[in-house]
């Protein structure tokens, strides 16, 4: 009988990336792979775009809120209906395991898996659990964490950051793929790369537009998320979205200015890139990026600048500070043991699935 596994997770790219790394490994080992998600979510888009042999199952999903809202009543029904749909899907497929990367859409499948006796493994990328994973943890077999957790919960297993990004061996790849960009850049200037999520990038976009004098001191790469800003000119390259050029652009940069999303932070750690973190504040998030940024700064991996302090003088001061302490940051990143390869995590997950299946 063919072994089956169900993946779930979505809402943002960060809740899909690890799944897309793991799925090909399961397929290669003969597993039949299914995915439960939102038909209109980024997870469905990414699965279709990947071309992987995955069967997608759409369920109803509702947003979980920590505050009172009449919308909670409607969304509670959506979540309940999502659980019923997930029960039907899982009962029909009879998978050996379910793996969840989080997000609101993942809660119903995890609950359904527990009710049907299917081992459910979940992954938490942030220093503190989001509401969806707080709920899912109660129904999970194991929760893998990227960060060392202060909580001593029995089902937690710290694995570090799972990333396929590695430190560059040379810049030859970047120079070949980005020859056109290099023609507009001054080799005597440091190169800064700005990257943020869909919402987080807007502050960077506006900052670069409002301060054209940045181009006098630096080459600027701006991954903007906005195609109307695309531009290649003297000391400036603005592009809305990159895939194959992502790592070459990173390698081209001397310093990366980023938000506080854990996936990007750990990718930069894996590449040993100098980074200045400008996290989303609590007015735009639940505060997880502030926690992630604090974790990185206290370990000497990066420097932080709060968004409300993002003025040109403050920014220039922080950039100078990072470059002045470059050797300290690189030493801390080089000695870090917080990274794990996709293959090693796959082996760990496979072993845990086998163990949980035997127990059942």
Curated annotation (Swiss-Prot):
EC number: 2.4.1.227
Record-linked Pfam families: Glyco_tran_28_C (PF04101), Glyco_transf_28 (PF03033)
GO molecular function: undecaprenyldiphospho-muramoylpentapeptide beta-N-acetylglucosaminyltransferase activity
Keyword Transcription regulation: no
Family annotation (InterPro entries): GlcNAc_MurG (IPR006009), Glyco_trans_28_C (IPR007235), GlycoTrans_28_N (IPR004276)
Entry membrane topology: Peripheral membrane protein
GO biological process per UniProt: carbohydrate metabolic process; cell division; cell wall organization; lipid glycosylation; peptidoglycan biosynthetic process; regulation of cell shape
Protein localization: Cell membrane
Cellular component, GO annotation: plasma membrane
Pathway: Cell wall biogenesis; peptidoglycan biosynthesis
SUPFAM superfamilies in UniProt: UDP-Glycosyltransferase/glycogen phosphorylase
Record: residues binding UDP-N-acetyl-alpha-D-glucosamine: 12-14, 198, 289
Keywords: Cell cycle, Cell division, Cell membrane, Cell shape, Cell wall biogenesis/degradation, Glycosyltransferase, Membrane, Peptidoglycan synthesis, Transferase
Domain of life (superkingdom): Bacteria
UniProt catalytic activity: Mur2Ac(oyl-L-Ala-gamma-D-Glu-L-Lys-D-Ala-D-Ala)-di-trans,octa-cis-undecaprenyl diphosphate + UDP-N-acetyl-alpha-D-glucosamine = beta-D-GlcNAc-(1->4)-Mur2Ac(oyl-L-Ala-gamma-D-Glu-L-Lys-D-Ala-D-Ala)-di-trans,octa-cis-undecaprenyl diphosphate + UDP + H(+)
Keyword Membrane set for record: yes
Family, similarity comment: Belongs to the glycosyltransferase 28 family. MurG subfamily.
Chain's role: Cell wall formation. Catalyzes the transfer of a GlcNAc subunit on undecaprenyl-pyrophosphoryl-MurNAc-pentapeptide (lipid intermediate I) to form undecaprenyl-pyrophosphoryl-MurNAc-(pentapeptide)GlcNAc (lipid intermediate II).
Protein name as it appears in the record: UDP-N-acetylglucosamine--N-acetylmuramyl-(pentapeptide) pyrophosphoryl-undecaprenol N-acetylglucosamine transferase
Organism this protein belongs to: Streptococcus equi subsp. zooepidemicus (strain MGCS10565)
Annotated gene: murG
